[in-house]
Regions:
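Well-ordered secondary-structure scaffolds
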Residues: 1-269
Length: 269
């Protein structure tokens, strides 16, 4: 492949954004595919926000929502990244990209197959390298984070977040009830354990969402987003002094991005 060839990235959450950012800065032509209602938590560093706002910028890379593939080249000419609502990846067959990166991070394969492109890359569990994709990238924190897997799968999803500042599961908040989020806090706020971060308005009334630990509110799902019970809705960083982390791509995302870039560069002529 050549640098001018099309790469399609499925998903634009915070981890996917790390990959999109790296590939854009490396000079590749990208098209990003998203759902019509992305559920990113770390919204300040998720290019998926362009679906709602029309455009968004993360670390000097701007993403712009497009309504059809015909608008893609114009966005490229402006030096930006086009984002198309296409959750099923129907545009992939039409555009015939050289690379498809599944960065949805759904912990399962939502439909990416090896025949979509000459090179297919899946991030995290749910893919088997050599079967449904060519390459899998490990996304679990630890010694193997970012490892390129050419045969087999990434570690299965444990449901236990990686440790940050001595906290794991405690730093991630899930919806205690179903309903619509009514946020009382914003990303970047210093919060205390027990503090009400949001209220979920459901059919059976209102349910408060409280901070689980003291720290920095690093992620919070969009206001008015409809959630189901158990849905991931917030993320607290116990390192209160790390405000910049709320607005910059994480070490984990950058590590994964480097591995994706390596996998693609091996195929560049």
């Amino acid at each position: 492949m050549k640098k001018s060839d099309l790469i399609i990235v499925r998903g634009a959450g915070d981890l996917a954004t790390g990959t999109i950012h790296r590939l854009k800065k490396s000079g590749f032509h990208l098209l990003v595919l998203e759902t019509d209602h992305p559920a990113a938590i770390r919204r300040q560093v998720a290019l998926s926000e362009a679906v709602y706002s029309g455009s968004t910028c993360v670390e000097n890379v701007e993403a712009v929502r497009i309504e059809s593939v015909e608008q893609m080249r114009q966005v490229w000419e402006e030096g930006k990244v086009p984002v198309l609502v296409d959750p099923k990846g129907e545009s992939i067959r039409l555009l015939k990209p050289k690379v498809v990166v599944d960065a949805i991070l759904a912990k399962k394969n939502l439909g990416t197959t090896k025949d979509m492109a000459p090179l297919t890359i899946g991030l995290g569990p749910g893919f088997c390298a050599g079967e449904d994709v060519d390459v899998v990238i490990e996304t679990k924190r630890g010694h193997n984070l970012g490892r390129i897997i050419r045969q087999g799968s990434a570690y299965p999803n444990t449901g236990i977040p990686g440790i940050i500042g001595g906290y794991g599961a405690e730093r991630v908040i899930h919806a205690p009830a179903a309903g619509r989020m009514k946020n009382r806090s914003k990303i970047g706020d210093i919060v205390e354990a027990g503090q009400v971060l949001a209220v979920i308005e459901g059919e059976d009334g209102s349910t408060e969402v409280s901070a689980t630990i003291d720290g920095l509110l690093r992620g919070l799902i969009r206001d008015d987003y409809p959630v189901t019970k158990g849905f991931k809705i917030a993320d607290i960083d116990p390192r209160k002094e790390e405000l910049a982390n709320c607005f910059t791509i994480s070490d984990k995302a950058r590590c994964i991005a480097g591995s994706v870039l390596e996998g693609i560069c091996e195929a560049v002529e």
